[in-house]
Design a protein with these regions (language model features):
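Repeated scaffold domains used in trafficking and secretory/extracellular systems
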Residues: 168-170, 214-223, 258-273
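Surface-exposed loop/turn elements that mediate protein-protein interactions on large endomembrane-trafficking
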Residues: 195-212, 242-260
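Terminal connector regions
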Residues: 127-162
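Bacterial N-terminal signal peptides
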Residues: 7-17
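Short beta-strand elements that form the blades of beta-propeller/WD-repeat-like
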Residues: 173-189, 193-196, 221-237, 268-284
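Positively charged n-region of N-terminal signal peptides that target proteins for export
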Residues: 1-4
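Low-complexity, Pro/Ser/Thr- and charge-rich linker/hinge segments at domain boundaries
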Residues: 153-180, 259
Length: 292
């Protein structure tokens, strides 16, 4: 028996080595921004593809590869690439695969020559219905010349968050429609963040916005104006608040920007000090008897 098995070991090892080398010609990886996402977030991740094969790979048809000549950006080459890249998403409980709900590509068009690599942004929530809290697994897949190259599966959770406060918006132009805004807390990295969620009475769920770190001394506030503006105020630290502005219409919800605001308890005193320092207001001299 030994005389039969031993000669096969080197051949088996060589075959396994060749198979491993073949499978490592193209590597694809998926890096999640976080391990937990609040319902409605876009679920951002970065796709990392490295081409160690002798071929030029990519997606998008005719794709230009750019280079530099001095300080100028020039076209170095143009390739016709028709490989496939996609992400498979499963519920970890029963390993049921989710259907893709979008028609768009997962990443931007690209072409990679031998020895090149590229990082590409993707938003998993744009392509799959992740509206229910659950644990999911995402696996990146690249297909070239009929060979499927799979990356390491990544697990992430979709959660409701801890509800802090809510507000309701009514629309004069559409009486039957109501929009509920809610602010929720959840950990993100090493700090706690506050998120704005929005859902319409007809079931439409809008994209959840991460408003950044919050210090939970005070509850955050939502103000809904009659003209469609929505303001969120939350405490960033001991002396500073963040004011976020949104524009909310029956068929649109847009983030308009944010600004820093001094702590309301010290803002008045600080303003007076600035006026005195600049000479804008002269201190009033009160007679001593007016204090009695």
């Amino acid at each position: 028996m030994k005389k039969v098995i031993l000669p096969l070991l080197p051949a088996l090892a060589a075959a396994m080595s060749a198979a491993a080398a073949s499978m490592s010609e193209i590597t694809v990886d998926l890096r999640m921004d976080a391990s937990d996402y609040v319902v409605g977030e876009r679920v951002r991740a970065v796709v990392d593809i490295v081409n160690s094969s002798p071929d030029t790979i990519g997606i998008g048809g005719k794709v230009r590869v750019w280079g530099k000549e001095g300080s100028n950006r020039v076209v170095r080459a143009e390739y016709d690439v028709n490989d496939r890249f996609f992400i498979e998403v499963y519920r970890t409980g029963d390993m049921s695969q989710l259907a893709k709900v979008s028609k768009g590509a997962f990443v931007a068009d690209f072409a990679l020559e031998t020895g090149e690599g590229q990082k590409l942004e993707t938003f998993i929530g744009d392509h799959f219905a992740l509206g229910e809290p659950n644990r999911y697994m995402a696996k990146p897949v690249f297909v070239h010349a009929g060979v499927r190259y799979e990356g390491q599966p990544r697990v992430f959770d979709v959660v409701e968050g801890v509800r802090a406060v809510a507000a309701m918006q009514m629309f004069a132009s559409r009486k039957s429609l109501q929009r509920e805004f809610s602010l929720v807390y959840w950990a993100r990295g090493r700090s706690e963040h506050v998120f704005l969620k929005a859902k319409d009475s007809n079931g439409r769920q809008w994209r959840t916005t991460d408003l950044g770190p919050i210090l939970r001394i005070d509850k955050p506030e939502i103000s809904v104006c009659a003209d469609g503006k929505v303001f969120v105020l939350h405490r960033l630290n001991q002396d500073q608040f963040v004011r976020s502005e949104f524009w909310s219409l029956p068929d649109a919800l847009e983030f308009r920007g944010r600004s820093s605001v001094l702590d309301p308890e010290t803002a008045g005193t600080q303003s007076v000090r600035e006026l005195y320092r600049e000479g804008g207001v002269k201190p009033k001299q009160n007679p001593w008897w007016k204090f009695w």
